[in-house]
Amino acid sequence: MCEMSEEYRESAPKGPPPPRLGTGDQKCVKCKEGLPVVVIRAGDAFCRDCFKALYVHKFRAMLGKSRLIFPGEKVLLAWSGGPSSSSMVWQVLEGLSRDSAKRLRFVPGVVYIDEGAACGQSPEDRARTLAEVKLALQTTGFPWHAVALEEVFSLPPSALRCSAQEAAGTEGAYKAAVDSFLQQQHALGTNGVERQSQHCAQDPQSPTGPPTTAQTQALSRLFDSVKTLTAKEELLQTLRTHLILHVARNHGYSKVMTGDSCTRLAIKLMTSLALGRGAFLAWDTGFSDERHGDVVVVRPMREHTLKEVAFYNRLFAVPSICTPALDTKAPEKASIHRLMEAFILRLQAQFPSTVSTVYRTSEKLVKAPRAGCAAGPRCLLCMCTLDVDTADSATAFGAQTSHLPQMQTPVTQARAAAGPCCCAGMGGAPGCCKREDPRAQVMEQLCYGCRVNMKDLPSLELLPPYILSEAQLRSQRATAEQEIREYLLGDSEDEAGTGES
């Protein structure tokens, strides 16, 4: 029997709790002398100096072992103001300083994309943020370019064309370039790098002024018309990439650095799988992305986790600017990106090897087309090769492709039934009156992932003009090639004719 006078709760201990064993005597796991200030993983406690050495070594090793960036090459740093990209700019800034043991040999520049109109910021908030951005960029001493996202409405269609890529240099070519660069710097004197950096810093900045009211309204209408947050984030990423590449080409940059961290790439890998972009994971998450031809995107921060970035920025006072994004204050299930982010971070909190496992899996992906599949056309938006067998209707891509010819408006069907082209017998171009449905014209030039996102955009006419113009140009080129295909000589016929002669 229970008695009312019984007390089942133990009395609270008096005095301070006993100290944990080993915390006072714990030393840095690397130098075994300094007091640890950072615990990256369980049991990995580093002092301030050893943590900085590890952090810098990861960044330098990622650039050094790839040997993609040659000495004297112009590299554009894509800076968003966030922790990872700010840390990347800080690493480059320290790597170019005179006190650095192994100095970086490329010529950097910084680009910032103002996305305030897409995120719903007021003009006053955008002006305040832009003033902070310009002040932060001026302190770096690098040439900088602050561009508004509205500039996508003035891009030329050539921004979506993959230019010819130079052949990758061999190890001997890289060593020869290093020797030539060192000899040049020795001839210029000890301050050769500073002179080159100062000359680059004196280059005029982007002359783009504030966006026009019409451009801002067009961008707002575009993002307001998108139904889901997932499609908005994908569209924003696509337009941002196009604008950065356009700035890089206009100012002579052959490489673009992004601040994607290990944690962010793990989330991106899972998100891309959910969005149907599994065929392009090697380009979306790898160290280098060569899909754009003359401009290569590199990710030197892919070995750093968000935890390491946060600790480094805190310990060494790396400045950053916090700006609202599309998913700011959005619930967990508002988009696939937010859902995957919450899923990965929750798993990482319970199982600390989650991010590293997903990240190491992405390193095993190979950038190669399928066997027997020649390099075909590229996606209009993401610029990836459409390496999918469209004849296989068992796949979602094949099923969508088979229905595209049936997507015709009543106007198109009426024109087709009206008879031959009006200009066919008057010296005009055959089929000039034949106009496809603009939506079908764009959709047939997209990969599966981009098609899924474009379904949430009711009208494609709200897209920037350069996308619609390039889609129309590609469609006309494909039609012309189809009409003259029977008059072209194939490779086998050409060789046979040469042998007979």
Curated annotation (Swiss-Prot):
GO molecular function: nucleotidyltransferase activity; sulfurtransferase activity; tRNA binding
Keywords, comma-separated and alphabetical: Acetylation, Cytoplasm, Phosphoprotein, tRNA processing
Record pathway: tRNA modification; 5-methoxycarbonylmethyl-2-thiouridine-tRNA biosynthesis
Renumbered residue ranges of the record's region Disordered: 1-23, 192-214
Annotated localization: Cytoplasm
Gene Ontology biological-process annotations: protein urmylation; tRNA thio-modification; tRNA wobble position uridine thiolation; tRNA wobble uridine modification
UniProt function note: Plays a central role in 2-thiolation of mcm(5)S(2)U at tRNA wobble positions of tRNA(Lys), tRNA(Glu) and tRNA(Gln). May act by forming a heterodimer with CTU1/ATPBD3 that ligates sulfur from thiocarboxylated URM1 onto the uridine of tRNAs at wobble position.
Family to which this protein belongs: Belongs to the CTU2/NCS2 family.
Protein name (database record): Cytoplasmic tRNA 2-thiolation protein 2
